[in-house]
């Protein structure tokens, strides 16, 4: 993409206050099931139908009062996925990459995290998401996609 470049986490954290940080997470679980009783499934991946009709990963903008990227991401997960997100937290060890947009406004750094959960945790998130604070506002539904 034009105007987007990969940067290190330390570079991202050194950017000034004119930059906004957004964090998103791929939440997945090994899936021992079989599709139609025959085709082995490998993983279930939690995605959401966003307000604009696109599929995406849960997360959002980090607020200055969050204190860290991970605190902001965990807050966003709780808002979007509901109380089931309180059963786990993402930390710096789950971080994978950062990408910055070069053209203002706004100047945004997108951070991506990956976390393996249990299948029970993924199913609990999927079931509880309609009761989440932001369900219906920022997101339309939660989907557990399999065979990835």
Regions found by a protein language model. Name each.
Residues 1-148:
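N-terminal leader/linker segments that precede catalytic domains of diphosphate-processing enzymes
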């Amino acid at each position: 993409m034009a105007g987007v470049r990969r940067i290190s986490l330390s570079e991202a954290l050194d950017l000034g206050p004119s930059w906004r940080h957004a964090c998103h997470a791929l939440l997945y679980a090994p899936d021992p099931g079989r599709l139609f009783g025959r085709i082995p499934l490998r993983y279930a991946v939690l995605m959401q139908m966003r307000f604009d009709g696109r599929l995406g990963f849960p997360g959002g903008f980090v607020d200055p009062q969050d204190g860290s990227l991970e605190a902001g991401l965990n807050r966003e997960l709780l808002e979007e996925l509901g109380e089931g997100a309180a059963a786990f937290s993402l930390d710096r060890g789950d971080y994978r990459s950062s990408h910055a947009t070069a053209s203002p406004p706004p100047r945004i750094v997108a951070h991506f995290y990956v976390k393996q959960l249990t299948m029970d945790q993924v199913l609990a998130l999927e079931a509880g998401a309609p009761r989440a604070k932001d369900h219906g506002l920022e997101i339309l539904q939660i989907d557990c996609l399999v065979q990835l």
